[in-house]
């Protein structure tokens, strides 16, 4: 019985700490706006600002779930290679020094024409 209570307590502690861990920090993508149209022949400029929180170190830039860049500046502009015509998702995610996502991210959906 004590073993079961101990496992439950440890699980609750880990779950609570991961929720708190994911909640610290913030990423904002100011451009492109969510729902924007982008040119399929041009790279997409992504303007952003990030507060990585206490455990974050850098950002990973994703297009449709594929990592396209690792960014160490907390504010600036990055580029996603030209996107094929259609709907796409661009995300910036805060990562630790060991490249583990902290759970802090921001995403926008765009349509390439």
What are these regions (language model features)?
Residues 1-10:
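Bacterial N-terminal signal peptides that target proteins for export
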Residues 44-52:
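Aromatic/hydrophobic beta-strand junction motif of beta-rich domains
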Residues 58-62:
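Beta-strand signatures of extracellular beta-sandwich domains
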Residues 67-74:
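Short beta-strand segments within Ig-like beta-sandwich modules, predominantly Fibronectin type-III
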Residues 69, 96-103:
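Short acidic/polar inter-strand loop motif in beta-rich domains
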């Amino acid at each position: 019985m004590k073993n079961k209570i101990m496992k439950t307590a440890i699980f609750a502690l880990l779950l609570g700490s991961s929720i708190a861990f994911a909640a610290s920090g913030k990423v904002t993508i100011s451009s492109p706006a969510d729902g924007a149209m982008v040119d399929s022949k041009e790279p997409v400029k992504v303007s952003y600002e990030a507060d990585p929180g206490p455990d974050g170190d850098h950002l990973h830039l994703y297009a449709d779930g594929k990592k396209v860049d690792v960014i160490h500046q907390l504010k600036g502009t990055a580029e996603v290679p030209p996107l094929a015509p259609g709907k796409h998702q661009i995300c910036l995610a805060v990562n630790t020094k060991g490249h583990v996502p902290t759970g802090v991210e921001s995403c926008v959906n765009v349509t390439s024409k």
